[in-house]
Regions:
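Left-handed beta-helix
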Residues: 2-109
Length: 109
């Protein structure tokens, strides 16, 4: 037989199985909360974390503000003091220092 090994894990959600759409939705929500929480701890203001979707490769500068219903994906970089207004979709793009983007804009690099 094969050897079975237990691996300690602080958060069971990091290793949960995904066997259907319900589990997939729960895992996506967990990752959204985890990413948003980390950025808020680093000083990014996210007015509505439930409607801000930030991909794992997105980076932020200092004192960035993210409004509700925003989508930031790919290798997007948001520099210091920028503000992302509601309804904005950014993918593989750069937001310059103190730039205000949106509302209701889609920008792809």
């Amino acid at each position: 037989g094969k050897k079975v090994v237990a691996i300690p894990c602080d958060d069971w959600q990091e290793v949960q199985g995904i066997n259907g759409n319900v589990e997939l939705a729960h895992a996506a929500k967990y990752m959204q909360e985890r990413i948003n929480t980390e950025w808020m701890k680093k000083g990014v203001t996210i007015y509505d974390p439930n409607t801000a979707y930030i991909g794992p490769n997105v980076t932020f500068g200092t004192d960035v503000i993210i409004h509700p219903n925003t989508y930031l994906y790919g290798d997007t970089t948001v520099e210091d003091y920028a503000e992302i207004l509601p309804g904005t979709w950014l993918e593989d793009t750069k937001v310059s220092k103190a730039e205000i983007v949106g509302p209701f804009i889609r920008r792809k690099g």
